[in-house]
């Protein structure tokens, strides 16, 4: 937290860079040619819409958007209400159940309530072709999200970065560990969760860090919008 700058303030120049314009152009051309791209165009930048720069308390780095029908909506690890909870998110819920008193596993995987509390759910690549994992990995999104991480590192103070898996850990190598809290573990995927994601206690450590700084902890129980009104 601690900056009055907005995403628009710090990203306006980046969004005019040729590589970024080319990324948007390529995605738009693929959509126009009839290729199904996830998430829908209106949702591509939802991570920034739901969590303003000055509100960022926690960053959870994902990699690729989900590439199945109706899943991706612009927030890493999250899926729309009514969509089956993906395996990695299910393992995140298992870790929460094991470590956060009173947490009960939700029946949905919609994490907007995390985002609105200051948890930036950032995929490092923001689009994907239907059914083709990593199909947009080389389009330029990685350059853009590297810049996003650098800007959070520069302009915010005391942010918790949850870096799960080698991809996220490489991406987060630039973070100033004197000013921010960096927590590393294997990815929550079923392939690696048992190698140290389970038992990492990251959700508890995150809230302890925030409490030590006098900030409100994250309520990790995901709430659907209608339930929170």
Curated annotation (Swiss-Prot):
PROSITE patterns: U_DNA_GLYCOSYLASE. Excises uracil residues from the DNA which can arise as a result of misincorporation of dUMP residues by DNA polymerase or due to deamination of cytosine. This is Uracil-DNA glycosylase. Keywords: Cytoplasm, DNA damage, DNA repair, Hydrolase. It comes from the Bacteria. It is an enzyme of class 3 (hydrolase). It comes from Klebsiella pneumoniae (strain 342). It catalyses: Hydrolyzes single-stranded DNA or mismatched double-stranded DNA and polynucleotides, releasing free uracil. Its main location: cytoplasm. The keyword Cytoplasm applies.
